[in-house]
């Protein structure tokens, strides 16, 4: 993994990720206390606290702090983003969707609690995420409202759900164009990654032009993230991924490597990340975490 290059000299991404992940894990654990009915809270916590990179909340915190905000201002939203991401994983793993048995190295939610409880756990995490953002202390209400609107767009038919629908409709087809693939992933994966970054900026009180700049950064890393995901589905093992490998090929899904080959896919991901990093140059060293996170996305192994 690249932890520093010409863009981030002297900045240790490994140390930053470890510190931020520890903070996020503690906040997530405190965000969701088990009460009645016990089963649903246990199911929610099972997937929410199952580990993972915590990339989305960390992006939110990094963007907020880069623009002069504090971690406290963004923490509720950071946790909410992970709740929404976890919901999408629970539902994505269901037999009606991707039908997966393994997630983050553990049995998927429906394998432990059954399909009915898994669906409800995802629903509950989604609704609680919006409540949790709304309960953020010491942040102006108009900023929270902007974040809630963007979250709704990112997770609904304009975003994640819309991308998933086109993904399902494209399964088994051999004539899927790269434009369709881009639509799927800018909505299914990229929309939530984008709001991670823009929400952090908004919470810090960013100007509209700063939010727009960070939106472009996030769009680039979001697409790069998915290209790398497609490559890893072919090249990595289930142990490395923490989930079943080769699922795209098995489901006859069109991927970037199937259209471009692995070498061109890697080059495209590198290009997108370079553009993302270049867009942050006005922020100097304050942007080191976001620059290094972009590098991490294209160099990760899972």
Swiss-Prot record:
Site annotation Plays an important role in controlling prenyl chain elongation: residues: 87-88
Chain positions recorded as Mg(2+) 1 binding sites: 92, 98
Catalytic reactions of this protein: isopentenyl diphosphate + dimethylallyl diphosphate = (2E)-geranyl diphosphate + diphosphate; isopentenyl diphosphate + (2E)-geranyl diphosphate = (2E,6E)-farnesyl diphosphate + diphosphate; isopentenyl diphosphate + (2E,6E)-farnesyl diphosphate = (2E,6E,10E)-geranylgeranyl diphosphate + diphosphate
The keyword Aminoacyl-tRNA synthetase is annotated on this UniProt entry: no
PANTHER family, per database record: FARNESYL DIPHOSPHATE SYNTHASE
Record function comment: Catalyzes the sequential condensation of three molecules of isopentenyl diphosphate (IPP) onto dimethylallyl diphosphate (DMAPP) to yield geranylgeranyl diphosphate (GGPP). Thereby, is a key enzyme for the biosynthesis of terpenenoids.
Protein name: Geranylgeranyl pyrophosphate synthase
Source organism per UniProt: Picosynechococcus sp. (strain ATCC 27264 / PCC 7002 / PR-6)
């Amino acid at each position: 993994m690249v932890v520093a290059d010409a863009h981030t000299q002297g900045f240790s991404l490994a140390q930053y990720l470890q510190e931020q992940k520890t903070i996020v894990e503690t906040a997530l654990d405190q965000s969701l206390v088990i009460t009645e009915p016990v089963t649903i809270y246990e199911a929610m916590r099972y997937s929410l606290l199952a580990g993972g990179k915590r990339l989305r909340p960390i992006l939110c915190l990094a963007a907020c702090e880069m623009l002069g905000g504090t971690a406290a201002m963004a923490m509720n939203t950071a946790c909410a983003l992970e709740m929404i991401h976890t919901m999408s994983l629970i539902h994505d793993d269901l037999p009606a969707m991707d039908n997966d048995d393994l997630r983050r190295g553990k049995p998927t939610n429906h394998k432990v609690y059954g399909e009915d409880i898994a669906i409800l756990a995802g629903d509950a995490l989604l609704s609680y995420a919006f409540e949790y953002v709304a309960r953020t202390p010491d942040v102006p209400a108009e900023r929270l409202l902007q974040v809630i609107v963007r979250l709704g767009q990112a997770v609904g038919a304009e975003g994640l759900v819309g991308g998933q629908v086109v993904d399902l409709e494209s399964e088994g087809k051999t004539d899927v164009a790269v434009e369709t693939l881009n639509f799927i992933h800018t909505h299914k994966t990229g929309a939530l990654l984008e709001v991670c970054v823009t929400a952090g900026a908004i919470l810090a009180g960013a100007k509209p032009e700063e939010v727009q700049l960070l939106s472009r950064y996030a769009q680039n890393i979001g697409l790069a993230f998915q290209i790398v995901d497609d490559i890893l589905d072919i090249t990595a093992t289930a142990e490395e991924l923490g989930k079943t490998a080769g699922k795209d090929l098995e489901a006859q899904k069109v991927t970037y490597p199937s259209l471009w080959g692995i070498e061109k896919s890697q080059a495209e991901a590198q290009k997108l990340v370079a553009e993302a990093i270049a867009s942050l140059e006005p922020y100097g060293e304050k942007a080191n975490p976001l620059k290094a996170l972009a590098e991490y996305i294209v160099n990760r192994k899972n």
